[in-house]
Amino acid sequence: MQPGFVGEVVTGLLREHAATAARETGPGPDERVPLSANPQMNDEELMHALVVEDSPQIAERLVELVSVPDRVAVVATAATEDEALAACDRHTIDLAIVDLQLAQGTGFGVIRRLRAATGANPACIVVLTNHAVPALKVAAFEAGADYFLDKSKDFATIPRLVGELLNTKKN
């Protein structure tokens, strides 16, 4: 195989799908480098999502479930309340998937910040937790959550929910 063959194949695929790739090598072996935003996409047409989850494996799966090419872009992931609040300050969020129990802090502060910050175009806030007890459900809705899902049985609901949100946004 020629040394530049893989690069030529990747470049061809990117060109065919009107995509670009970040040029950074990433933080280390086996780390993923995010694709750059498609320059032809109107940013206002994209739904911006935030994933707040302290388990890297679950966060990665949520990014896969929530992302829809040319429709939904995950603009940030956060494992702690502080990281999530910083992401809320940096980005306009249309959809947030929030775990309640985090490595530092809780999802309740994130929910309250999102609810306070989104004003006329409120973010859709989905709580996804392993602790789906009635008291936490009530507290999540009081803080401003729109949906309350149990990780053990509602995980597969997320793509359908994202589809419904996209249909609502389109209308």
Segments from the language model and where they lie:
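Acidic catalytic/metal-coordinating carboxylates
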Residues: T80, T106-G109
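Acidic, metal-coordinating helix/loop segments flanking the phosphotransfer/catalytic sites
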Residues: T77-L95
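A short, hydrophobic beta-strand element within the central beta-sheet of small alpha/beta folds
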Residues: P122-A132
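Short amphipathic alpha-helix used as the core "switch/output" element in two-component signaling
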Residues: F108-N121
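Conserved acidic carboxylate
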Residues: E53
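Two-component/phosphorelay signaling modules centered on CheY-like receiver
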Residues: P56-A76
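Active-site residues of response regulator receiver
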Residues: D99-L100, T129
